[in-house]
Amino acid sequence: MHIISGSKKGRKIITPKRNFRPTQSKVREAFFNVLDIENKTILDLCSGSGAIAFEALSRNAKHATMIEIDREAVKTIFINAKEIFADDNSLYKIKRISACDYLKKTNDKFDIIYLDPPYHSKIYYDALNYILKRNILNKDGILAAELGLNHYRGFIKNINDAVSCIMKYDIRIYGDSVLIIFKYV
C-alpha cells in the first residue's frame, strides 16, 4: 500500500500483520477527491496503519490524530510515521486507546473525522453519539464512516432516525465496502 497523492506520494505504508482490513486505495482516493483537506485537522479513528491520516498529511492537512486500540497496529503506525515524516512529529499525534474512550475524554475538535472500525464492530452509533454530543466535529465539518455493505442500510436508517444535524454528503460503494460522507450543519 502507498500514499496516493501529495508531497509524500508513492511512500510505502506497511499494514499490521494480522486480521486487519486496510482501507482500499480506491476508497481513500474517492474520499480525498471530494474534500478540500488543506489546512484541516483530521481525526482517524480505528486508524489501523494510519493510511488515512498519512494521506491527509501528504495533501497538506494541518494536523492528524490517529486513534487505535490494537498494540501491533499502534507499533505499525509509529513505524509508518517515522518512515514517512522522519522526526517531524509536530504534524500528528498517535494514541493507543479505544475510539469511544478517546471520544469520551477529548477536548479536541476536528474538521474531518474518519471512522473505520472492523466491519462487525458495534461502535459506529456510540462513536457518532459522542462526536455529536461532545461537539468534537467543527461546524461544517466532515464525518466519514467506512462500513461493510451488509451494515449499510441499517446504519443509514438509524442515523436518519436519530440525528438531524448531519446530512449525507456522498455515498460510494466499492465491492463490500461503503464509504458514507456526512456534513455537520
Residue locations for each model-derived region?
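Class I S-adenosyl-L-methionine-dependent methyltransferase catalytic core
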Residues: M1-V185
